[in-house]
Amino acid sequence: MSGRFVRASKYRHIFGQTCKKELCYDNIKLSNNAWDSNLLSVNPFYLSVNWNAGAGGALAVIPLNERGKLPDQVNLFRGHTAAVLDTDWNPFHDQVLASGGDDSKIMIWKVPEDYTVMEPYEDVHPIAELKGHSRKVGLVQYHPTAANVLASSSADNTIKLWDCEKGVAHVSLKMDVMCQSMSFNADGTRLVTTSRDKKVRVWDPRTDKPVSVGNGHAGAKNPRVVWLGSLDRFATTGFSKMSDRQIALWDPTNLSEPIGGFTTLDTGSGILMPFWDDGTKVIYLAGKGDGNIRYYEYENDVFHYLSEFKSVDPQRGIAFLPKRGVNVSENEVMRAYKSVNDSIIEPISFIVPRRSESFQSDIYPPAPSGKPSLTAEEWASGKDAQPDLLDMSTLYESKGTVEKAVSATVPSAGAQVQKHNEEKVETPKPEAQPVSKPKESAEEQKPSKEPEVKPTTPSASKVEEPSKKRDEDNHQKEETVTQPKREKTPVEKSFPKPASSPVTFSEDVKKEPSEEKKLEVSDEAPKAAPLAESKKVEEKEPFYVSKDKKDISAVNLADLNKRFEGFEKRYEEELAIRDWKIAQLEDKLAKLTEAIKEKCN
């Protein structure tokens, strides 16, 4: 009997599932910088995007639950004076983010509480700045077990290990050329790098000399590297001399050659970005410039091909969600966020189809919990520890509710940084003082105190125009006018501001209080934003007013969120039905296969 044997694997049927367009993130302005990075970074709550901000550098942070089309102008995280090249979320604090830029600076950011991109908000400034590199910082990556320890790679041919809380670099690893990719192992005791000299180096992060060095891919394009989590192995992707795309598996104790040699995959031209799932022992390879994502299962020092997610939409940036953020109830083992045409970010769920609706413990081993095992001082003193792990069944019992990781302290590195931030915040204060006078006078003229405006009909709204100076005797006239159409007059909308920021939207119009005042709306009139008469306001129309001048209120946003939740619920129900049908078809196919084999025998 001759037959074909299929390797048994519980991940053999993993498939990638996209979502509908209305559940994607639209109106994205992805950075067009030529530096080779992933451009995106994600944690269970936020998605960071290297933004095309024109002059200077900026990044955008999008809450994952705010899907749909973003406003034309969004709130940005500004502080870099050149393009942002790479970002990484703190694994122990879901609101803290690090970024490296073309200006040789490293910025630490904190996402404000109740942050949103759907409503106007002041640009966010860094809470700390790490200075030490002399050229652009192309890579930043947090330590997997020690809180507030950050690795950064620069074009000055150094890799620095920072204590973000103190703002000092404990170690500086010197290289002959620039590092192009780096990755920690699971406990952070080893760091592997690839570089322009086509060498692969394994480092002890506390020493300034590599533990071992070997020859990597021979091609001219940038190689990538990823450590295989808790395993004593790492993988690289790159190109051969003939520009064939390759993958290689390495033993960090012997870099003379890769295990099994360099494996050729195809002749594609895009760089392969590797992502490792330590729970399933599956590696995902996303090609930059093409729309496909391949995945292989690691077993006995061999990568076994599983399947491929195919798409006609090429990706230039991509990020994978940490394990504690996946949807356990839907048997989702990984989730990717890929850019589409540099204007849309599309979530892709990788699902293991199962018939049972109970928790699938065999595909969800414990995963990193988001709690540090060491402090930065303990790590610097030489201590090591395994990562703190989370029982994934708790996510199933909580119906996918993930708690924010806030174990790490928020860094406030260096007195220079604090002074720098204070100057940015305090300078607008003297300018804002004359603006407060019209507010006080407007409060004195509220209709509740001096009702001078009466509507002619219950449905019509009228407003009272404050008096103006028209001659030297300060002669005043009061007029009652009907509220003009919104097509002619822009609407100014007031939103709550963070208490720490003294800057207000009213600073855009700086005139004497006697020359310009705002109109008041009577109690009987429907709620609307105050009208402004200044020509400057007409020229700089607020970005939250749409072309047809429709009011966007919190109530409307709540309705939209409810509709999105309804769409998601319906999508999940249809997905479950589809998976059930697939499982039935697989059973029928298996039975038919067995019947055919019996007949052949």
UniProtKB/Swiss-Prot annotation:
Coiled coil ranges: 556-600
Keywords: Actin-binding, Coiled coil, Phosphoprotein, Repeat, WD repeat
Any one Gene Ontology molecular-function term assigned to this protein's record: actin filament binding
One Gene Ontology cellular component annotation held by this UniProt entry: mitotic actomyosin contractile ring
Placement of WD repeats on the sequence: 79-119, 132-172, 174-213, 220-260, 266-306
Start-end of Basic and acidic residues biased regions: 419-429, 437-453, 462-495, 507-526
Residues with PTM Phosphoserine: 500-501, 553
UniProt cross-references to InterPro entries, sorted A to Z: Coronin, DUF1899, G-protein_beta_WD-40_rep, WD40/YVTN_repeat-like_dom_sf, WD40_repeat_dom_sf, WD40_rpt
SMART domains noted in UniProt: DUF1899, DUF1900, WD40
Classification via Pfam families: DUF1899, WD40, WD40_4
Alphabetized Gene3D superfamilies for the sequence: YVTN repeat-like/Quinoprotein amine dehydrogenase
Chain spans, region Disordered: 361-386, 407-540
GO biological process, one term: actin filament bundle assembly
Subunit structure: Binds to F-actin.
PANTHER family listed in its UniProt record: CORONIN
Family: Belongs to the WD repeat coronin family.
Protein name: Coronin-like protein crn1
Organism the protein comes from: Schizosaccharomyces pombe (strain 972 / ATCC 24843) (Fission yeast)
Gene name in the database record: crn1
